[in-house]
Amino acid sequence: FKEHDQAEMTKFEETAKRVFGGAKVVGDIATMNQALVSGEIDLHLTGGTYSVSPARADGNPNLRGITPKKGPMAGGKGGISWIEVTSTVNNPELSPLAVEFLEYVQQPETAHTVAFAEGTFNPVAQMGNPACFDLFTKEELDAIQWDSLEEEMARSVEYDIVPDYEKALDLMTAAKRAKG
């Protein structure tokens, strides 16, 4: 989460070319999950709970999102946690429904529904409320890897802004396209 010099960007480009060049499949989460389920591939980068949870919910508990025990991040951590929030913004013309909507999505039943939005299943902050947590079945908790969430988070740093994101994305996109 820092600005990278030319040597670092060159190394990133070379790594992206090597990773995507050696990939059997390059695709979106659904494509990658199908390839995992069918046995076409053994792993996919990058992912996590959100990427394999639908496949786990469909009866594939052998698939798991795994955070490396160590890596190049601060403190030697190997993962990055991505936490999304819903909030109002400092807008002089804030919708009168904004606060009402926030209250709605905080309700235990709604938060449970949000946790299982189509395509990705995720833990939600409202699970700290027993009224919400109690709505989750054993199978749903298993699908979102609740058993290892604390451990995965401990191995991760919080996401931050990547100053040269656009340049890195261009390099990665070019490497993916070269794969074909």
Q: Across the structure, where does each feature detected by a protein language model lie?
A:
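Ligand-binding pocket segment of bilobal, Venus flytrap-like solute-binding proteins
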Residues: 1-67
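Non-transmembrane alpha-helical segments in soluble domains
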Residues: 13, 17, 33, 37, ...
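Soluble non-cytosolic domains of exported or imported proteins
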Residues: 27-30, 92-96, 159-166
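Solvent-exposed loop/turn segments at secondary-structure junctions
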Residues: 49-53, 71-73, 93, 108-109
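Short beta-strand->loop
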Residues: 61-80, 89-90
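Short coil/loop residues immediately preceding or within conserved phosphate-binding loops
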Residues: 83
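Mature extracytoplasmic/periplasmic domains
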Residues: 86-152
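Conserved C-terminal helix/tail region of periplasmic/extracytoplasmic solute-binding proteins
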Residues: 143-180
